[in-house]
Amino acid sequence: MLEGLVGLLLQAEISKAQIEVQDSVDSYYVAKADSATGHVIEVTYDVNSRGEIAGDLEEFRNVVAETLSDSRGWVRANVKFTEVESGGRLHMVLAAPAEVAAASSGCSDKLSCTVKPYVYINDDRWLGGSDSYNELGVTLQNYRRMVINHEVGHFLGHGHVTECETSTGLAPIMLQQSTGLLGCKPNSWPLPNELWVKGI
């Protein structure tokens, strides 16, 4: 009886808190929070390619849609993403490396890049991930989720950060995980303290 009551109280407490859960499929931790409430920011987006790519555009479209609608993602910051055929506020582009580099002097053919309102996902990284993730055995699926959330974070007004989350050691989504984890645990989703939007 007492054990049952304690269990119920513990469940109630956990349901109110922002907690860290293990993704058993991929064997690493992601941050989860309660559903966001308040004013919803609606962002339309379209999906295109640029240059000669080896990746499949429809697969890219599907992963983008799944990532942007995932309850662990930017929806927790009250952002609702809706795909449109053209004319979106956000343009998700699977781009050849040379096209990424040509988008801005601040972009590189080695990485993905955001030049608002365009998010350029580097085709090489899309297909091969990054050394920082591959060396730890993190799946390509979770690398793709991370890079989409990171670059969309720039569109939402975020800059880069360089420190792990204090209590969990997780990498913030705005840490440049493609170039190195700086001792943090890999993480594909925005942390609770990153759930804000500016300038859109």
Language model features by range: what are they?
Residues L5-I53:
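Disordered inhibitory propeptide/activation segment of secreted metzincin zinc metalloprotease zymogens
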Residues G51-A54, W74, P97-A101, R125-G128, ...:
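Solvent-exposed loop/turn segments at secondary-structure junctions
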Residues E58-R145:
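Metzincin-family zinc-dependent endopeptidase catalytic domain
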Residues T44-D46, H91-V93, V119-N122, F155, ...:
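Structural recognition of the beta-strand scaffold that forms the well-ordered cores
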Residues Q141-H160:
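Active-site recognition of the HExxH zinc-binding catalytic motif
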Residues E135-L136, H150, H154, T166:
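Compact recognition or signaling/catalytic modules
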Residues S15, H39-I41, S86, C113-V115, ...:
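A short, polar/charged loop/turn motif at coil->beta-strand junctions and beta-hairpin connectors
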Residues L2, S108-L111, V115, V119-D123, ...:
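Metalloprotease/metallohydrolase-associated module, dominated by Zn2+-dependent proteases
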